[in-house]
């Protein structure tokens, strides 16, 4: 019997804990399931596994992240390249340790540790997707504040300035003529990051050129806002949970029309799949195909792909998250579905 090793942190209540709770209800005759936490790797106490084949499912390492990357008292700007470099080193060490501990075993990673951090680099992700024919927002590469002012004041462009190596809707600045907003803070000429993962509230910084000059010196990506499909008095996006070549669930997310993002962690609201009936079936079919292609292009097997639909019903990929938060079980039991998918896929695999 093959073994599935699930590794995460107990502080990850949104994904890992929900997955473990589902496993407690699951009685498998197909695979042996074992859970472990990242601190066991640090202590050299990973479980002994007799199976010749091990399937490893990696969740987000919250404890490491909070201790070594976005740590308490950190004074730098959120989402900089230092975050990314440390994260990649962490995963290299995890890969090396797992290969050493389970030497001689055949290991299948759901998401390979050497590939799992790539979604943190928004620039690289969108370059890969664009080269593979997937629609992404129009990028801009200037770091001259005069160019930005020209784009928004003379050409009436609407722009997003996002930290290059961030997630969860943190570190976003939106700019259009007469309306600049950011969920950073700007104090005494310095950009200040929130100390929380949630509720990075937006403030008005319209025409604050000093802020603009400063943010342009940071690790950011600049992209044109999607001219989104108009729907009532709300903004929306869709998160598609992709597992290998299947979309397990489509999660519509909405926010009030003057909001900057529909991200749940920053004030957005989840909708049921009934929401999808507002769109022609071919649009949802396109989103499904594009999400599957996106995950394949990024060489991972499980991710949340965030898409937007423009006024002409074209689908654009906005973000990719290799560690997507799981929806509440009452909405859709993602853990249960993944468990069944893994069992179907790996029961007889050698």
Describe every region a protein language model picked out.
Residues 155-263:
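Phosphate-binding site of ATP-dependent enzymes
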Residues 262-302, 309-350:
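C-terminal active-site "lid" helix and adjoining low-complexity regulatory extension at the edge
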Residues 28-42, 186, 190-191:
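A generic structural motif
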Residues 12-14, 34-150:
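Conserved N-proximal alpha/beta basic substrate-recognition cap immediately N-terminal to
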């Amino acid at each position: 019997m093959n073994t599935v090793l699930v590794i995460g942190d107990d502080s990850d209540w949104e994904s890992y804990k929900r997955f473990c709770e589902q496993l407690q209800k699951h009685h498998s005759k197909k695979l042996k399931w074992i859970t472990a936490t990242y601190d066991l790797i640090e202590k050299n106490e990973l479980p002994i596994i007799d199976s010749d084949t091990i399937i490893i499912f990696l969740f987000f390492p919250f404890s490491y992240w909070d201790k070594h990357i976005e740590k308490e008292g950190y004074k730098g700007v959120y989402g900089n390249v230092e975050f990314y470099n440390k994260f990649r080193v962490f995963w290299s060490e995890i890969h090396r340790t797992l290969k050493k501990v389970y030497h001689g075993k055949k290991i299948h990673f759901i998401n390979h540790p050497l590939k799992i951090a790539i979604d943190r680099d928004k620039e690289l992700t969108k370059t890969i997707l664009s080269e593979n024919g997937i629609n992404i927002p129009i990028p801009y590469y200037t770091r001259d504040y005069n160019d930005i002012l020209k784009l928004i004041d003379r050409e009436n462009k609407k722009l997003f300035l996002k930290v290059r190596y961030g997630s969860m809707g943190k570190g976003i600045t939106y700019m259009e003529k007469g309306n600049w907003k950011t969920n950073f803070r700007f104090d005494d000429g310095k950009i200040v990051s929130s100390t929380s993962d949630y509720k990075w509230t937006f403030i008005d910084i319209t025409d604050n050129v000093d802020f603009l000059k400063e943010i342009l010196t940071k690790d950011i990506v600049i992209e044109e806002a999607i001219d989104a499909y108009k729907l009532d008095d709300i903004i929306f996006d869709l998160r598609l949970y992709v597992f290998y070549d299947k979309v397990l669930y489509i999660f519509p997310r909405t926010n009030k029309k003057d909001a900057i993002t529909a991200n749940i962690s920053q004030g957005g609201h989840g909708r049921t799949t009934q929401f999808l009936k507002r769109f022609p079936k071919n649009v949802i079919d396109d989103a499904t195909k594009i999400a599957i292609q996106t995950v394949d292009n990024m060489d991972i097997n499980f991710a949340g792909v965030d898409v937007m639909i423009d006024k002409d019903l074209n689908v654009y990929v906005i973000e990719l998250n290799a560690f997507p938060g799981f929806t509440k079980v009452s909405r859709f039991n993602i853990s249960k579905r993944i468990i069944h998918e893994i069992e179907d896929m790996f029961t007889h695999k050698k």
